[in-house]
Regions:
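Non-catalytic DNA-recognition/assembly elements of restriction-modification systems
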Residues: 1-17, 133-136
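DNA target-recognition patches
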Residues: 14-48
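Specificity-determining recognition surfaces
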Residues: 17, 107-136
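Short edge beta-strand segments in beta-sheet-rich domains
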Residues: 23-25, 81-84, 129-131
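Short aromatic/basic micro-patch
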Residues: 27, 63, 125
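Hydrophobic residues at beta-strand termini and immediately following loops
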Residues: 28, 89, 134
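A short beta-sheet element
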Residues: 52-53, 58-106, 110, 122
Length: 136
């Protein structure tokens, strides 16, 4: 069976924006992602988030790269903005089925491999430069 580097399977969308007041309604932070489910059940903020955030589109896979051992993965339920402590991932559909992709990202197979490349002790984080080279 062929193996693929993660960058051959997924696109890491790095488009960012500085939030405006109305973005508080469509903001997702890591605190909104629950381990064990791809569904988002809460979102938003009382005030506009501060600092640049990642732009997400409905259907994107949101992955918590900070403290990845918490296994926070979800499917974006709408267009909006996402925490810069995460990654906005999209499947390369010529390689992986778009419906399977979120299941793969939330699998122990993927998450265990990703956690192993986390750097830092207080708040371990996964860097794209390391993740993109993992083979699956």
């Amino acid at each position: 069976m062929s193996k693929f580097r993660f960058e051959e399977i997924a696109i890491n969308s790095t488009e960012k924006k500085k939030p405006v007041e109305s973005d508080k309604y469509t903001y997702l932070g890591l605190e909104h992602l629950d381990p064990g489910t791809l569904k988002v059940s809460r979102f938003g903020s009382d005030v506009a988030p501060i600092g640049e955030k990642l732009v997400m589109k409905k259907g994107d896979v949101l992955f918590g790269k900070r403290r990845a051992y918490q296994k926070k993965v979800a499917i974006a339920p709408f267009d909006g903005i996402f925490s810069a402590h995460g990654m906005v991932l999209r499947p390369k559909t010529e390689v992986i089925d778009s419906e399977f992709f979120p299941l793969f990202i939330s699998s122990d197979y993927f998450l265990d491999a990703a956690i192993k490349i986390s750097v830092g002790s207080l708040s371990p984080t996964i860097n794209w430069k390391d993740l993109k080279n993992l083979e699956f």
